[in-house]
């Protein structure tokens, strides 16, 4: 099983390293316009293989993506001084206009996993260009709120002193400021949050909800302030999504993909619970939310929709 990664910067290289640490697949190919960077990252990661799992890590070009089951796209340009967000998006849209057809030329059956930010909009753009060469949107997936969901579960687990693997909770909508933490659906080992807290005699109140909400929503800002970029968390999230696809696990993940019409949300790309397998998205589910969460989710979708409309694809 073979994975391609286009863009070997912090996120792409860390994703490759995470694949090695998890033992996902057999081969990873790094593609970057800076071939020397890709080769150096491949060599460095290959040297970690003896301490982890027997994967082959190489650098190559688009032609070397042939046979890939999944291609992660983390390529993009940085923001220039004085450049607006929309101008940056426009330039990254042009990058994707070149990257996506080139990837699909050599790996026409691959599932595309988009990790370039803002991931909702960039996934929508990728699906647009993939559609032009006949690839369905179900095979174009964004990392979405997978990392946000992990942060949410981890913080709840720490507050309750419970292994976060037993916490079921989702962050939906935009991967960004308008994302929605679905507190009404939180369960611990299948037990509703409030019922679990009552049984354990744990006091949890609105202040706790607000503190966790703030930490999830501001996590990336906090990390970037201290070290300039985030990559370990998202790299690990990417590796997990790739694992689900390669193993056809049929797992529920909060990835993003263009919406046809789910809970009244359509013609936009945001994160909802998706059943993911070897061919990409199998089905998108309508979460059962309270009135406030439903309203917030629609508002979040509108934030993304407005940006997409400005791009005039």
Please describe what each predicted stretch is.
Residues 49-70, 76-107:
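A structured beta-alpha segment of the ubiquitous adenosine-cofactor-binding alpha/beta core
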Residues 132-139, 147-313:
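C-terminal substrate-binding/catalytic lobe of Rossmann-fold NAD(P)-dependent dehydrogenases
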């Amino acid at each position: 099983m073979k994975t391609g990664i286009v863009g070997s910067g912090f996120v792409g290289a860390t994703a490759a390293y995470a694949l090695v640490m998890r033992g996902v697949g057999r081969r990873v190919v790094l593609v970057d316009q800076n071939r020397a960077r890709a080769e150096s990252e491949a060599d460095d990661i290959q040297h970690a293989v003896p301490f982890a799992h027997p994967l082959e890590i190489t650098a190559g070009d688009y032609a070397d993506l042939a046979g890939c089951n999944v291609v992660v796209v983390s390529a993009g340009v940085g923001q220039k001084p004085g450049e607006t967000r929309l101008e940056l998006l426009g330039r990254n849209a042009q990058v994707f206009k070149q990257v996506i057809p080139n990837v699909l030329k050599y790996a026409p059956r691959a599932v595309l996993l988009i990790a370039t930010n803002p991931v909702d909009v960039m996934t929508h753009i990728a699906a647009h260009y993939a559609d032009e060469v006949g690839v369905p949107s179900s095979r174009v997936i964004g990392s979405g709120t997978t990392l946000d969901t992990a942060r949410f579960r981890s913080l709840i687990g720490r507050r309750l002193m419970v292994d976060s693997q037993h916490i079921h909770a989702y962050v939906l909508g935009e991967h960004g400021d308008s994302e929605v933490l679905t507190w009404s659906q939180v369960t611990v080992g299948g037990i509703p949050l409030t019922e679990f807290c009552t049984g354990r005699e744990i006091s949890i109140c609105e202040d706790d909800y607000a503190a966790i909400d703030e930490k999830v929503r501001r996590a990336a800002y906090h990390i970037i302030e201290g070290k300039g970029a985030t990559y370990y968390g998202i790299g690990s999230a990417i590796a997990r999504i790739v694992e689900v696809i390669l193993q056809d696990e049929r797992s529920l993940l909060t990835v993003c993909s263009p919406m046809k019409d789910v809970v009244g949300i359509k013609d936009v790309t945001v994160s909802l619970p998706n059943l993911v397998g070897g061919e990409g998205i199998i089905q998108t589910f309508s979460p059962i939310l309270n009135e406030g969460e439903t309203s917030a989710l629609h508002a979040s979708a509108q934030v993304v929709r407005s940006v997409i409309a400005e791009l005039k694809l």
